[in-house]
């Protein structure tokens, strides 16, 4: 049986890892073994932060809604209770976008929520 040398495959694999580690600091960007460790850690961070991003955006939407609703004399929790009572089924993302881009439409929604309380 002939001897199989894997020089080409190893070089390709190393090149792929080094290419993915572009932008890292120190030897993490050009030393294969260290780059591989840093890449695995970066994948862990990416996995974790994809979950955290959802929480962060939800809290951002709530902060925006709360700030906009306070100008109408309500607080966030009372406003959401009024929306539920009025039967208005709009999610927080849309509400925050309305509060920023179309304050008049958001004001109508706030008035509906006030009327339902």
Swiss-Prot record:
Coiled-coil region(s): none
GO cellular component: ribonucleoprotein complex; ribosome
Disulfide linkage: none
UniProt cross-references to PROSITE patterns, sorted A to Z: RIBOSOMAL_L20
MF terms in GO: rRNA binding; structural constituent of ribosome
Record's keyword terms, sorted: Ribonucleoprotein, Ribosomal protein, RNA-binding, rRNA-binding
CDD domains: Ribosomal_L20
GO BP: ribosomal large subunit assembly; translation
Family to which the UniProt record says this protein belongs: Belongs to the bacterial ribosomal protein bL20 family.
Summary of the function given for this chain in its UniProt record: Binds directly to 23S ribosomal RNA and is necessary for the in vitro assembly process of the 50S ribosomal subunit. It is not involved in the protein synthesizing functions of that subunit.
Protein name as catalogued: Large ribosomal subunit protein bL20
Upper classification of the organism: Bacteria, Pseudomonadati, Pseudomonadota, Alphaproteobacteria, Rickettsiales
């Amino acid at each position: 049986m002939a001897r199989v040398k894997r020089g080409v495959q190893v070089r390709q694999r190393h090149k792929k890892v080094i290419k993915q580690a572009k932008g890292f600091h120190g030897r993490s960007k050009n030393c294969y073994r260290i780059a591989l460790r840093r890449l695995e850690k970066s994948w862990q961070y990416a996995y974790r932060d994809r979950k955290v991003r959802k929480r962060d955006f939800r809290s951002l939407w709530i902060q925006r809604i709360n700030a906009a609703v306070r100008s109408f004399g309500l607080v966030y929790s009372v406003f959401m209770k009024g929306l539920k009572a009025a039967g208005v089924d709009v999610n927080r993302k849309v509400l925050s976008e309305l509060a920023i881009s179309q304050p008049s439409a958001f004001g109508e929604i706030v008035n509906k929520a006030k009327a339902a309380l």
